[in-house]
Amino acid sequence: MTKITKIEVQKNNKERFNLFLDEVFEMGIDIDTLVRFNLKKGQILEPSDMENIQKYEHYRLGINMAIQYLSYKKRTEKEVRQHLQQNEISDIAIQQVIDYCYRESYINHEDYAESLKNTMINTTDKGPEIFRQKLYQVGIEPNIINTYVPIYEEEQSFEAVIEVAKKIMKTKKGPEIKIRQKVLQSLIQKGYSMDVVQQAIAELNFEQDENILDDLLQKDLEKVYTKQRRKYDGQQLVMKTIESLMRKGYKYDKIKSKLEESGILDE
């Protein structure tokens, strides 16, 4: 048995106390622990009492960590659980803390999904598939994901998708077919469905300025020809050059005309 000889308020936190047993510092305790066990100077504690106090204090430590972690932004159960594990809270205490967070609505996965949906639609250029992935990564239940992804699709305006496509298109140069492919790939990577992507692409004008396209073809021709002549010569060199340029999206008649203009066909 031990005796509580002193309980003092901690200097840096008025809601925590230092507990002294038999004149020796034993541990710091939270105000809730103090009240729950009605601890006071002169009280005699059995070993079982100390075990219960330590377990409860560990639980309270976990709650305080969780609340502080949740104070910065909304979190999911998975995120809170990982945070507590990283801070060496026991598995039993973690589950108790998680249960507490649900009871007090500190954790609410539907609220989390709603908030993330609004944030992504209003501040990012990402589509519903990226939204789905983010929900999955933080441990949101499948039924909630399947409920909120269609809502995301419905609330994200088609005009916004077209604007994203236009911005992508402005950064690309080259033949029409290649730019179309790059815009399609970029939109898919941003999480838009193929159906929405194809509808958006149908609204865009991919025609390129002929002078700019001619300059690009000339530059690509020089690069490709220089590279291919290290391996081939004669007619084979010409064919390999044409094949490479066609894979880049240039039309055969434009390539042939540029080859004639460059004098390569006469070599």
UniProtKB/Swiss-Prot annotation:
InterPro entries in UniProt: RecX_HTH_1st, RecX_HTH_3rd, Regulatory_RecX, WH-like_DNA-bd_sf
Keywords: Cytoplasm
Location in or out of the cell: Cytoplasm
Pfam family, one: RecX_HTH1
GO BP: any one term: regulation of DNA repair
Keyword flag Cytoplasm: yes
Highest taxon of the lineage: Bacteria
GO cellular component: cytoplasm
Protein's job: Modulates RecA activity.
NCBIfam families, A to Z: PRK14135.1
Matches recorded under PANTHER family: REGULATORY PROTEIN RECX FAMILY PROTEIN
Family classification: Belongs to the RecX family.
Annotated HAMAP family: RecX
The name this protein goes by in its record: Regulatory protein RecX
Organism encoding this protein: Staphylococcus haemolyticus (strain JCSC1435)
